[in-house]
Curated annotation (Swiss-Prot):
Pfam families: Ribosomal_L21p
Name of the protein in its database record: Large ribosomal subunit protein bL21
Family, per entry: Belongs to the bacterial ribosomal protein bL21 family.
Functional note: This protein binds to 23S rRNA in the presence of protein L20.
Keywords for the protein's UniProt record, in alphabetical order: Ribonucleoprotein, Ribosomal protein, RNA-binding, rRNA-binding
Subunit structure: Part of the 50S ribosomal subunit. Contacts protein L20.
A Gene Ontology term for the protein's cellular component: ribonucleoprotein complex
Family matches, as InterPro entries: bL21-like, bL21-like_sf, Ribosomal_bL21, Ribosomal_bL21_CS
Gene: rplU
Length: 102
């Protein structure tokens, strides 16, 4: 059984026991979080939401909070002496999917 959930402005396909990296959540490591924006549930009994599946939830356990690898953002305009270099590290939350309730 799998589900498509909406979190952090993205849609993610998840299965039970899977570990996924999502946009940062306000939860500490070891806590349990519930996703209620379930858009689709697949498997033996398929359910499609309009826009979400009523009564469907996905439960996950927060493994850790972290920050992704650093990327360099560079802005440049020729002949204008404009150079701007900036780094960015996106925060993320690592979660393990425990149960899909449909």
């Amino acid at each position: 059984m799998y589900a498509i959930i909406k979190t952090g402005g993205k849609q993610i396909k998840v299965e039970e026991g899977q570990t996924v990296y999502i946009e940062k959540l306000a939860a500490e490591a070891g806590e349990t979080v519930t996703f209620e924006d379930v858009l689709f549930v697949g498997g033996d009994n398929v359910k499609v939401g309009n826009p979400t599946v009523e009564g469907a939830t996905v439960t996950a356990k927060v493994e850790k909070q972290g920050r992704a690898k650093k990327i360099t953002v560079f802005r440049y305009k020729p002949k204008k002496n404009v150079h701007k270099k900036q780094g960015h590290r996106q925060p993320y939350t690592k979660v393990t999917i425990e149960k899909i309730n449909a």
